[in-house]
């Protein structure tokens, strides 16, 4: 996360942040739980060897990154818009892909022999809360 924030600063993308309301933090916590249950719990293919596990982690990490509305947006009165020309959108989507791979690693690491989802949920919550803290520090939280 520090690398992402530093990268945004170096690339001049930190001023392109979206502003969020202070109470959005509850959605960020709920999203961590729900996304881990779906992506690291339900969708991942296990029990068919490491190649299948790694391949499914890569494919579902891509899906995870693309599911976040940085390269696209949907508004009821405007419909779907694609945003492929934004450096910020590509940067953030790329980091979401990397974070997703990290969450898979946390779930399937040797120190987690039961492959519990709790460590990946905790890692995801920490990442989301740190993102919230950075946005607050940078002035992108409306109180």
Regions found by a protein language model. Name each.
Residues 8-14:
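Catalytic phosphate/metal-binding cores of nucleic-acid and nucleotide-processing enzymes, i.e., regions
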